[in-house]
Amino acid sequence: MISELNKKNKLNQNSNSLNVSYVRNINIIFGNYPYPDIIHNFILDIKNNLDIKMENYTNVKGNMTNWNYFLDKSKFINFITFLINKHQTTHFDIFGHFFEKKTIQNAWGNEIKKGDSLDYHKHPCLHGVLYLTKGCDLILPELNLKITPEPGDYYIFPSEILHGFDESKENFNRYSLIFNIVENNNAFEYSKKLRAVRSRSHT
């Protein structure tokens, strides 16, 4: 769920996106991935593939997989395909001809325990998060917004959006899958990788 930090401002919200004006007009795409069994499997993937070298090494002051763990996983590619099918009519600039125009640069999982935090930072590109569990809110201070995680909820953000959170006070772990989307400089290579993954999933 997405809500305001300061209730004095009014949100301009549509059924699956939200316009927020500050220095520039911001569009946040959101929805729910309604497959709890796949969400559960994503959690297991993260739990079983945490990279000890990444612990507290990045803006994530907690545990995470390596940056590219989910890139070639068929479950993740199916999720991206779901996003394309869901949003290409309303957000054609992003999802139209997606695999020809865009590349998923990184896709990783986070595990946030009590006392862990996320340093406030920005991504230089389009980026998204798929929440796999409930957990502490994601704070977007410049937009006066907070995002309360619910399993299956996803959000796609434009570049340069400051976000983070202070130490989690939850008594349970928070799991999420994060990905960066960049303009495609090598459509052929990514398409080749995608075909190879799909071919493996049918054998």
Model-derived segments and spans:
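Non-heme Fe(II)/2-oxoglutarate
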Residues: 1-100
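Alpha-helical context
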Residues: 15-22, 56, 104, 108, ...
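Extended aliphatic helical segments
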Residues: 20-23, 60, 129, 182, ...
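Catalytic core of non-heme Fe(II) oxygenases with the double-stranded beta-helix
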Residues: 96-168, 172-190, 194
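Short, cationic low-complexity segments
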Residues: 197-203
